[in-house]
């Protein structure tokens, strides 16, 4: 569960390393975001010479959360860290590589480009 002021690692090669959530999209009173949800975030840490600069406001989709999530078959999925992938306005990833596994929920929410770039889908 990601909320305002949550910090997430960036799981792609855009140049950003850490982002801070400033808004959960999907309704005026929506408080939490899970795997496959879109957030607005600001870049808190970036590598020098990257495409993304510190302080930039970006949109991102969450790919991993430490809070367990129950699936329709009764199983639970959780990860060791909170991570997100930066996206363009048309919901395609801004980077060309994805690092680490991503949740299967991304396939159900039509983020097929991220699913195809990911090394593992859990």
Swiss-Prot record:
GO terms for cellular component: cytosolic large ribosomal subunit. This is Large ribosomal subunit protein uL14. PANTHER family: 50S/60S RIBOSOMAL PROTEIN L14/L23, LARGE RIBOSOMAL SUBUNIT PROTEIN UL14M. HAMAP family: Ribosomal_uL14 (MF_01367). Binds to 23S rRNA. Forms part of two intersubunit bridges in the 70S ribosome. GO terms for biological process: translation. It holds the Pfam family Ribosomal_L14. InterPro entries: Ribosomal_uL14, Ribosomal_uL14_bac-type, Ribosomal_uL14_CS, Ribosomal_uL14_sf. Part of the 50S ribosomal subunit. Forms a cluster with proteins L3 and L19. In the 70S ribosome, L14 and L19 interact and together make contacts with the 16S rRNA in bridges B5 and B8. Belongs to the universal ribosomal protein uL14 family. GO terms for molecular function: large ribosomal subunit rRNA binding; structural constituent of ribosome. Keywords: Ribonucleoprotein, Ribosomal protein, RNA-binding, rRNA-binding. Gene3D superfamilies: Ribosomal protein L14.
């Amino acid at each position: 569960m990601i909320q305002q002021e949550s910090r997430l690692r960036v799981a792609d090669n855009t140049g950003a390393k850490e982002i801070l959530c400033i808004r959960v999209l999907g309704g005026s009173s929506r408080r939490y975001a899970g795997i496959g949800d879109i957030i607005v975030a600001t870049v808190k840490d970036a590598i020098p010479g990257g495409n993304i600069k510190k302080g930039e406001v970006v949109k991102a989709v969450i790919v991993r959360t430490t809070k367990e999530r129950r699936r329709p078959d009764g199983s639970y999925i959780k990860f060791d860290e909170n991570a997100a992938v930066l996206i363009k306005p048309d919901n395609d990833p801004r980077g060309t590589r994805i690092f680490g596994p991503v949740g299967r929920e991304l396939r159900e929410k039509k983020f097929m480009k991220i699913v195809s770039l990911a090394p593992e889908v859990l």
